[in-house]
């Protein structure tokens, strides 16, 4: 049996905001059928104002339109490159480029992360919702574990009822594997800050909205922990890079929680192997051995990915 490792997250109608449940089912039902022919942010915000009065509903509707109608296109990276001689010229070109990106994103329905974030920010501005774009580093794959910090992504934070709502419309729109696969998801909407930090590290750390500071180096060394309800300290090894010689001799993995299904793991070959579990209460441990070279280890709870490690 073979599985391609991707970040699999559940799409939910109800979002849990820091322990409080808010029912978005009505908003989603209406916004899902918004026209895909809108050509400006003003058309979108005007429609949202007609349908919803609460800021949290308006924000959800705006996010819904963006993730359902904008396709990820890496060629957009090359569209807005420019040169400048002095800072004033740079600032003017940046402002002009920003407007061009927003217009092109809505009109042509394609963008990279910058277009997704800027367009949603502009719609929020027209809805009088306080929102701002965040630039930072993200982990998409095990190959991102251990590398230096890079400002390679943009997402957005809105402040509603004095609470930050963290969201990534780019990741929420779908995934890109050779081409764009449209898969609108709320898995990256109103994400719990400590879970978001597993994969998104802001350039200005205050934008993480977590109590305890985490260094860029620590973020870089974390493994990829997928499920929202599992904390980093519930899994051992805690470092995301493991040595092949340790894997060859037998690497012990410990989970401080009870898996829902049979634990499986896979290497580069994609073949799922069943783990020989040793359980003690809700905790479980097992040993993984590799007979040949591999660049990664991915552990699954049934068909749901739990954690991934880079092997060197």
Named regions from a protein language model:
Residues 115-196:
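Hydrophobic/aromatic-rich core segments of domains that either
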Residues 20-109:
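Secondary-structure boundary elements
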Residues 1-22:
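Bacterial Sec-dependent N-terminal signal peptides
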Residues 112:
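Active-site acidic/histidine clusters and adjacent loop/turn architecture
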Residues 12, 39-43, 118:
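A generic alpha-helix surface/boundary motif
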Residues 51, 145-147, 244:
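Residues embedded in well-ordered secondary-structure elements
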Residues 177-312:
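Alpha-helical and coiled-coil interaction segments, frequently adjacent to or embedded
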């Amino acid at each position: 049996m073979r599985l391609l490792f991707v970040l699999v997250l559940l799409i939910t109608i109800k979002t849990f905001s820091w322990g409080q449940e808010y029912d978005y089912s009505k908003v989603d039902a209406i916004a899902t059928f918004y026209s895909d022919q809108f050509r400006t942010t003003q058309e979108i915000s005007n429609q949202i104002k007609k349908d919803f009065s609460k800021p949290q509903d308006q924000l959800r509707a705006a996010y819904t339109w963006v993730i359902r109608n904008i396709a990820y296109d890496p060629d957009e990276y090359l569209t807005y490159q420019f040169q400048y001689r002095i800072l004033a010229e740079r600032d003017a070109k940046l402002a002009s480029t920003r407007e061009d990106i927003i217009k092109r994103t809505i009109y042509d329905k394609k963008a990279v992360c910058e277009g997704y974030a800027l367009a949603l920010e502009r719609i929020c501005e027209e809805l009088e919702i306080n929102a701002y774009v965040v630039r930072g580093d993200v982990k998409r794959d095990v190959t991102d574990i251990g590398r230096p910090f890079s400002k390679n992504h943009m997402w957005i934070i809105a402040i509603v009822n004095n609470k930050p709502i963290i969201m990534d419309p780019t990741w929420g729109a779908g995934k890109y594997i050779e081409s764009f696969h449209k898969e609108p998801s709320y898995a990256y909407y109103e994400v719990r800050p400590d879970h978001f930090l597993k994969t998104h590290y802001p350039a200005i750390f205050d934008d993480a909205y977590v109590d305890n500071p985490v260094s860029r180096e620590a973020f870089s060394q974390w493994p990829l922990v997928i499920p929202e309800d599992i904390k980093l300290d519930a899994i051992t090894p805690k470092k995301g890079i493991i040595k092949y010689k340790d894997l060859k001799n037998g690497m012990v993995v410990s989970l401080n929680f009870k898996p829902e299904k049979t634990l499986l793991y896979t290497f580069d070959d994609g073949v799922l192997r069943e783990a020989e579990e040793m359980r003690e209460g809700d905790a479980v441990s097992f040993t993984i051995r590799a007979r040949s070279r591999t660049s990664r280890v991915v552990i699954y709870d049934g068909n749901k990915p739990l954690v991934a490690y880079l092997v060197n």
